UniProtKB/Swiss-Prot annotation:
Plays an essential role in heart function and development by regulating the organization and function of the sarcoplasmic reticulum in cardiomyocytes. Residues 114-185 are annotated as: Required for dimerization and maintaining endoplasmic reticulum morphology. It is found in: Endoplasmic reticulum membrane; Sarcoplasmic reticulum membrane. It is a multi-pass membrane protein. The chain crosses the membrane at residues 35-51, 58-75, 95-115, 118-138. Belongs to the DP1 family. The keyword Transmembrane applies. The keyword Metal-binding does not apply. Disruption phenotype: 60% of embryos die 7 days post-fertilization. Embryos have cardiac developmental defects including a lack of cardiac looping and atrio-ventricular conduction defects with dysynchronous beating rhythms. Increase in RTN4 protein expression levels. Morpholino knockdown causes apparent sarcoplasmic reticulum membrane vacuolization in ventricular tissue along with structural discontinuity between sarcomeres. This is Receptor expression-enhancing protein 5. Residues 52-57, 116-117 are lumenal. PANTHER family: HVA22-LIKE PROTEINS, RECEPTOR EXPRESSION-ENHANCING PROTEIN 5.
Length: 189
């Protein structure tokens, strides 16, 4: 198992893309194998996520930048399988963000929290057929949604109606205020 993972990692380091091109240049200049360079970068990021200033920002960038980039590429591609994969990631990311918001007061006390969060997000975006986001969606989020879909639809409709009513009220108030301002300006001329 470990040998197979190492082989997949090494194969990924030799695929043609921007990161592997940079690794190839560093490997050529230093003579250090690109897998060792990648391990060093991963170790540095892991240590930084534990003790570094701005670990929260780094973790959120890791969980956002690559998935956002790949999501845009998926939208622009003719295939729809990749769209579903990345929509699933964003649903899980959103649910995780809401849960994290409410649990943050407890989670911030754990010294390895940002490292664990980053590992979780990388697991969710892993380029495998059954990565973390797909597993969490199919086992937890989807069953919950299907069980409560009618209730959720009613709540969403109620919120939409209230938001539309509030927007109409604000629009009417803005029209009245504009009319009053124009009336006051005409009185001065």
């Amino acid at each position: 198992m470990a040998a197979a993972l190492k082989q997949r990692f090494d194969n990924a380091l030799h695929e043609k893309n921007m990161v592997t091109d940079l690794l190839a240049k560093i490997e050529a200049k230093t003579g250090v194998n690109r897998s060792y360079i990648a391990y060093a970068v991963i170790a540095f990021i892991a240590i930084y996520l534990v003790i570094g200033y701005g670990a929260s920002l780094l973790c959120n960038l890791i969980g956002f930048v690559y998935p956002a980039y790949i999501s845009i590429k998926a939208i622009e591609s003719p295939a729809k399988d990749d769209d579903t994969k990345w929509l699933t990631y964003w649903v899980v990311y959103g649910v995780f963000s809401v849960v994290e918001f409410f649990a943050d007061i407890f989670l911030s006390w754990f010294p390895f929290y940002f490292l664990a969060k980053c590992a979780f997000l990388v697991w969710c975006m892993a380029p495998t057929p059954s990565n973390g986001s797909i597993m969490l969606y199919t086992r937890i989020i989807r069953p919950f949604f299907l069980k409560n879909e009618a209730k959720i639809d009613n709540v969403m409709k109620d919120l939409t109606d209230k938001a539309a009513g509030a927007a109409d009220k604000i629009k009417d108030e803005a029209k009245k205020a504009t009319a009053n301002i124009m009336f006051e300006e005409k009185k001065h001329y």
